[in-house]
Amino acid sequence: MTLVKTCGKLYWAGEYAILVPGQLALIKAIPIYMTAEIKASDGYRLYSDMFTYSVDLRPDSSYALIQETVALVEEYLTTQGVDLRPFSLDIRGKMEREGKKFGLGSSGSVVVLVIKAMLAFYERLADRELLFKLASAVLLKRGDNGSMGDIACIVSEDLVLYQSFDREKVAHLLEKEELQAVLGREWGFSIANVEPALEFDFLVGWTKEVAVSSHMVKQIKDNMNASFLQSSEETVANLVKALQMGQEETVIDMLEQASQLLEGLSSDIYTPSLRQLKEARQDLRAVAKSSGAGGGDCGIALSFDQDSTTLLKKRWANLGIELLYQERIGHDDESEG
């Protein structure tokens, strides 16, 4: 039996803009894990604790994402001369509580998890680029129009600067060419680890809301113009530079700017709870913003001294915002859940 795991992710900056090829986003891995156990079996058995039953490879709508991942990895392994054999795959870790998702990128986590499990089962090594391409190929074949930023972060398990690629072009190639040929091509993305040169606490607050409306989606599409994209790219690049050079004030300014850019896209991104989460950092050596799609789910904060961290956590608790995760970055004591 082999055990593998994948993490979740949250955006620090660049969400929405990253949907446009060539744009930048800064994304942080969150060690809230999904796990998979895989072992040899007489027949295929796939189980996820999202559901109350298991399946084989016969199409099942609930298990479609997992089954399609298995199919693509088997296609890849066949090109590598691997003899396929049946297995039992057991997936656990729903990244939700009381039926409400945390918004940590669980579909991306599932795809990467299945790929890692199968490659481990067949004792095949894969670097970050291959994992990213395989997982992205699964989602592109499904018609997923996401940026693949969650995949970039999940395969890295770190704080990463991601530059997006032309997904339409690669999806077209996947329709026309053999998988192996497409995997061998240059896709035009980049993934780089970012190491901050300053000390701070990173906190994740969960609002327990999910409220992405069609009105919000339309507003965002209408407002994602050239000016927004240029501002977003400059903000992310300056944020990364400030983190690497240890410039606390610039980090705060750039995250504030990233937050304002999101507000300019749609008034619905900041729900009342997310606005409270953000404004709780008033008078503190800290900065907070919505993370990801907005309209609910999670917000993040960076706090630059212990008193600010303590006060921010207290304010969040009083507002009914749950501290989902806390990590001490640049400290000797790395994290606390």
What are these regions (language model features)?
Residues 103-125, 158:
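DPxDG-like acidic metal-binding loop motif
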Residues 84-88:
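Residues at or immediately flanking beta-strands
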Residues 2-13, 17-20, 27-83, 96-99, ...:
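C-terminal nucleotide
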Residues 91-104, 118:
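Short acidic, glycine/Ser/Thr-rich loop/turn "cap" segments at secondary-structure junctions
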Residues 115, 299-300:
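Short hydrophobic alpha-helical segments that form membrane-spanning helices or hydrophobic packing faces
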Residues 104-106, 288-295:
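Short glycine/threonine-rich catalytic loop with a Thr-x-Gly-x-Asp
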